[in-house]
Amino acid sequence: LGSAYVRYYSRLRAAGDREGCAKLNGMFLITYLILGAAVLAIGFGLSYCDVVFGKKLTAEEISLAQRLLRILTVNAALTFPISVFESHVTINERYLFQKIVAMGKQVLNPLIMIPLLLMGYRSVTLTIVSLIFTVLSGVINIFYCLTRLKMPFAFHRYDFALLREMFGFTVYVFIGIVVDNVNWSIDRTLLTWFH
């Protein structure tokens, strides 16, 4: 989805259309908020369906799986609107900032997770820490985009024609990602089928 934002934003920026850039930012943010809300609704809905977890789990394991699914759903839902700001950092070529945020997450993650594991905390705590990292990196990106990059937003006149065009572009990108993932994981899939 980030590649669609980069493509259309760079096209508008090259044309010098600042108002178009602001409308595009608003449109992407609204679209990604809607997608995030859909992920939230689907994830929470699935967390209440015992069929999803199968029949081999105990009641305690199902309860744990439900909590984990809810936390991971919130994490996934937040990544959609946050990706608008991360893509804006990319389009403005602030790679050093991106690398510092990514390295901060990579360094802090084991520094926090390993002591928590050694203290006896389990998967729910680790998943919550992962959610906290997502929120913190998102807040940092949002703050950077709004203060340093002066990211403009306009939320009037939603451009449905552009949304259709963008959807067509995104479908091809999505198919490419799925094919790439299938190619990279076919060996594991075959092993699980035949094992």
Language model segments and positions:
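Helix-loop junctions and terminal segments of transmembrane helices
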Residues: 1-15, 90-91, 149-150
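Membrane-interface helix-capping segments at transmembrane helix termini in multi-pass transporters
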Residues: 16-26, 37-73, 119-128, 153-155
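Residue-level signature of transmembrane alpha-helical cores of multipass secondary-active transporters
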Residues: 32, 68-72, 76, 98, ...
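Membrane-embedded alpha-helical segments of multi-pass transporters/permeases
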Residues: 40-48, 71, 110-118, 138-146, ...
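Alpha-helical transmembrane segments of multi-pass membrane proteins
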Residues: 45-46, 57-82, 99, 103, ...
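Membrane-interface junctions at transmembrane-helix termini in multi-pass inner-membrane proteins
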Residues: 77-104, 121-124
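Membrane-interface helix-loop junctions in multi-pass transport and translocation proteins
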Residues: 96, 107-139, 147
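Interhelical loop/hinge segments that connect adjacent transmembrane helices in multipass membrane
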Residues: 124, 141-189, 193
